[in-house]
From Swiss-Prot:
Signal peptide: none
Keyword Aminoacyl-tRNA synthetase: no
Keywords, in A-Z order: Repressor, Ribonucleoprotein, Ribosomal protein, RNA-binding, rRNA-binding, Translation regulation, tRNA-binding
Annotated organism of origin: Ruminiclostridium cellulolyticum (strain ATCC 35319 / DSM 5812 / JCM 6584 / H10) (Clostridium cellulolyticum)
Subunit-level organization: Part of the 50S ribosomal subunit.
Name of the protein: Large ribosomal subunit protein uL1
Name of the encoding gene: rplA
HAMAP family (alphabetical): Ribosomal_uL1_B (MF_01318_B)
Job of this protein: Binds directly to 23S rRNA. The L1 stalk is quite mobile in the ribosome, and is involved in E site tRNA release. Protein L1 is also a translational repressor protein, it controls the translation of the L11 operon by binding to its mRNA.
Entry-linked PANTHER family: 54S RIBOSOMAL PROTEIN L1, MITOCHONDRIAL (PTHR36427), LARGE RIBOSOMAL SUBUNIT PROTEIN UL1M (PTHR36427:SF3)
Length: 230
């Protein structure tokens, strides 16, 4: 694969055989963020679990102390007083059947997170095949199915992110922007890793954190020593 000049320059700063300390890796991720925009710093964590088994799933949500640096657009499925509560709490879109039709008929995805009250899940369930593959389906474990819509919205706007395994047993999460600086990125990193370690399934055997890699949006991967995280 052809890599651009900036990527190649950034790669020279990285020792690909070394397992870095978390703080050092985050500093390097910021140095290798050479794009003209404020790159996102991402963490990719491979776990020693088998996601094919129901008792080895790892999924949840955590509020990063310094947020992600991204403005998050929230869609809420609610009615009556709960719809009013959602509007007052700062939801970007609030509705019911009319929004479901809009998504189905117009392929509309101008939002980042979907929240629903439990009584709306019967109709929201019709969107499973549309929202599911995009990771947008409301889920109680992520706190996006809730009667307390005001808290759900506040948490999301404050920097709550969802983490879950992909098919290769890897979790991919943003932990902020390159402009955050090392202290804020380390706070967010520790918070995310702490939540994932706490969520370790009882059925998981052997080493839980197989690998931890940090990268900027356009930069190379930097390996972190997983034994320095747990």
């Amino acid at each position: 694969m052809f890599r651009g000049k900036k990527y190649q320059e950034s790669s020279k700063l990285i020792d690909r055989l070394k397992l870095y300390e978390p703080s050092e890796a985050l500093e390097l991720a910021q140095k290798t963020a050479k794009a003209k925009f404020d790159e996102t710093i991402e963490v990719h964590i491979k776990l020693g679990v088998d996601s094919r088994h129901a008792d080895q799933q790892v999924r949840g949500a955590v509020v990063l102390p310094h947020g992600t640096g991204k403005k998050v657009r929230v869609l809420v499925f609610a009615k009556g007083d709960k719809a009013k509560e959602a509007e007052q709490a700062g939801a970007d879109f609030v509705g019911g059947e009319e929004l479901i039709s809009k998504i189905q008929n117009e392929n509309w995805f101008d939002y980042d997170v979907v929240v629903a009250t439990p009584d709306m899940m019967g109709v929201v369930g019709r969107l499973g095949k549309v929202l599911g593959p995009k990771g947008l389906m409301p889920n109680p474990k992520a706190g996006t199915v809730s009667m307390d819509v005001a808290k759900a919205i506040a948490d999301i706007k404050a920097g709550k992110i969802e983490y879950r395994l992909d098919k290769t047993n890897i979790i991919h999460c943003p932990i902020g922007k390159a402009s955050f600086g090392n202290e804020k990125l380390m706070d967010n990193f520790r918070t995310l890793l702490g939540a994932i370690i706490k969520a370790k399934p009882a059925a998981a055997k052997g080493q839980y954190l197989k690998s931890v890699v940090v990268t900027s949006t356009m930069g190379p991967g930097i390996k972190i020593n997983p034994l320095r995280v747990e």
